[in-house]
From Swiss-Prot:
Binds 1 Ca(2+) ion per subunit. One of its GO terms (biological process) is proteolysis. Ca(2+) binds at residues 543-544, 576, 578. One of its GO terms (cellular component) is extracellular region. The gene is SED2. CDD domains: Peptidases_S53, Pro-peptidase_S53. It comes from Trichophyton verrucosum (strain HKI 0517). Glycans are attached at residues 265, 403, 572. Gene3D superfamilies: Peptidase S8/S53 domain (3.40.50.200). This is Probable tripeptidyl-peptidase SED2. It is found in: Secreted, Extracellular space. Its cofactor is Ca(2+).
Length: 596
């Protein structure tokens, strides 16, 4: 039986990957059908797929030099964020490069009306038959063995040698999967005694029993401060996976916890067919959580809910063995939409509470999307991500066929151009919450801005967990905020929600408050935060030295499948930066004194 299964596997791989000719070069390749998936047959030749092609930049350092120049206090260009046209000029490939790619597509049968040249990216739509000829591959239908969802994908694709040096990636091709909201626990409706507490009682509780905007204002030194209504201080909230923010629930939340904000609302940015449907049985908890705390803590700021259709891709591992049926790429769709907005329409803060294991995405995809976060940073956007809810890891094994024991960093939290937010719990003192993800990237090297801080932690750590992580990788999270038992109105009822998905929007609102403080003094918004945080801003955060994360328990917390067990696996909160709470939680008054 095992031999038969192995022969069938070889047959499926062979069917999925034709032999590339001498005139083609392989761009991406999977050695085997990802675990949990089965090839069930050839794709319909007439099926239409929307592709994104990322053009390899001739001088990638130009983007990195620019983001550090405009984001590092003390440099001559600090705060001089680029306009969209300036960013386009920075990234625009040579004319002959673009022409060669467009020519390849049109000569290969793609309708010119279905090609959109966006400078360093090209979007094109075509049918499976044409795509197979273009990329010298065969697209097949792959079925998820857990939920019978099917996807059109391939295990390998190629492009002509003549243009191969210009092609960083084409997707969706080899990507299997989805994102997850980073909310580790959704509680039942709250007890009557909590529901009946007054706003003043919640503030006095200092977030011990339930987190509300009142206690966060008290805990983090915001007081009654509100932002001013300005066009140059906008907040964007990311929405994926058909999560829809409900206006009625926001109204209930503000009436209950922020009565002075009653009547304030948010606008919608609908991307690639995204919706924000009101009412109905669909999921809204994550979207409501994000919107209620962003609006509640900065209610005069202009807030936009960016709802993007589709579900993100991955190469499945034990943490994420399944996905929904949709060929769109939401991160790419959202990011390409945002970087093309005029600078006066961009959010100055973008908060996202979604992520996946870093290893579940091909390296070309993580690099391309991380560079898009950097592009937003050059235009003055502070990109905020939750760090994740699996501690050092959940499955704690590699998905390369070796199943080696390994901690699992979370992406996009591990991208060096985002600010990653860990979680805390309790007060007097705050402690690291056990589910707060953190660690070290296996994809991105440690950026110079955090080199000294991370070296200090590694010296304390010594040889513990040696071999389970890359000590030279980008370390995360950067900072933290409360992450346990947030009061949220969902479908008309108050519910408690935990996860770093709560920490991220709370921090985003505080960053918007800092931007408001700077703008009132004639200074620009903060933009990409990390160079400032690691050089000076860290002194405005309360260091968390108690508690720690946990993970690698032997069972994956999402799928329930048996996984690698690492006894006592944890990152501990320590003095200074640590990979569970970063530099700690915000003290608004202290932060205003160390702003650039």
């Amino acid at each position: 039986m095992r031999l038969l299964k192995f022969v069938c596997l070889l047959a499926s791989v062979a069917a999925a990957k034709p032999t590339p000719g001498a005139s083609h070069k392989v761009i991406e390749h999977l050695d085997f059908v990802p675990e949990g998936w089965q090839m069930v047959g050839a794709a319909d030749p007439a099926a239409i797929i929307d592709f994104w092609l990322a053009i390899e930049r001739e001088n990638p350092e130009k983007l990195y030099d620019t983001i550090y120049d405009v984001s590092t206090p003390g440099r001559a260009q600090y705060g001089k964020h680029l306009k969209r046209e300036e960013l386009d000029d920075l990234l625009r490939p040579r004319v002959e490069t673009s022409e060669s790619i467009i020519s390849w597509l049109t000569n290969g049968g793609v309708n010119p009306q279905h090609i959109r040249d966006e400078g360093d990216w090209v979007k094109f739509s075509t049918n499976v038959k044409t795509a197979e000829k273009l990329m010298n591959t065969r697209f097949n239908v792959f079925k998820d063995n857990l939920n019978s969802v099917s996807k059109i994908r391939t295990l390998e694709y190629s492009v002509p040698v003549a243009i191969s040096a210009h092609v960083q990636m084409i997707q969706p091709t080899t990507l299997f999967g989805r994102q997850k909201p980073q909310n580790s626990l959704i509680l039942n409706p709250l007890t009557k005694d909590l529901e009946s507490m007054s706003v003043e009682e919640f503030a006095a509780s200092q977030c011990r029993s339930l987190v509300t905007t009142a206690c966060l204002r008290e805990l983090y030194g915001l007081g009654d401060r509100v932002t001013q209504a300005r066009d140059d201080n906008r907040i964007g909230v990311s929405g994926f996976l058909e999560e829809y923010a409900q206006y009625r629930d926001l109204e209930l939340f503000l009436s209950r916890f922020e009565p002075s904000a009653k009547g304030f609302n948010f606008s919608e940015g609908l991307i690639a067919g995204g919706k924000n449907t009101q009412g109905g049985p669909g999921s809204s908890t994550e979207a409501n959580l994000d919107m209620q705390y962003v609006v509640g803590l900065s209610h005069k700021a202009k807030v936009t809910y960016y709802s993007t259709a589709g579900r993100g891709p991955l190469v499945p591992d034990l943490s994420q063995p399944s996905q929904a049926s949709n060929n769109n790429e939401p991160y790419l769709e959202q990011l390409r939409y945002l970087v093309k907005l005029p600078k006066n329409q961009l959010p100055s803060v973008l908060t996202t509470s979604y992520g996946e294991t870093e290893q579940s995405l091909p390296a070309s995809y993580t690099k391309a999307t991380c560079d898009l976060f950097a592009q937003l940073g050059t235009m003055g956007v502070s990109v905020i991500f939750s760090s994740g809810d699996t501690g050092p890891g959940s499955s704690c094994q590699t998905n390369d066929g070796k199943n080696a024991t390994r901690f699992n960093p979370i992406y996009p939290a591990s991208c060096p151009f985002v600010t990653s937010i860990g979680g805390t719990v309790g007060t007097g003192p705050e402690r690291a919450v056990s589910f707060s993800s953190g660690g070290f990237s296996d994809r991105f090297p440690c950026p110079q801005y955090q080199d000294n801080a991370v070296k200090g932690y590694l010296k304390i750590l010594g040889n513990q967990w040696s071999g389970l992580f890359d000590p030279n990788g980008r370390a995360f999270p950067d900072i933290a905020a409360q992450g346990s038992n947030y009061a949220v109105y969902d479908k008309g009822r108050m519910t408690g929600v935990s996860g770093t998905s709560a920490s991220a929007p709370a921090m985003a609102a505080i960053i918007a408050q800092l931007n408001d403080f700077r703008l009132a003094k004639g200074s620009p918004v903060l933009g990409f935060l990390n160079p400032w945080i690691y050089s000076k801003g860290f002194s405005g955060f309360t260091d968390i030295v108690d508690g720690g994360s946990r993970g690698c328990t032997g069972y994956d917390i999402y799928s329930g499948l048996k996984a690698k067990k690492v006894p006592y696996a944890s990152w501990n909160a320590t003095k200074g930066w640590d990979p569970v709470t970063g530099f700690g939680t915000p003290n608004f008054q202290a932060l205003t004194k160390v702003l650039p």
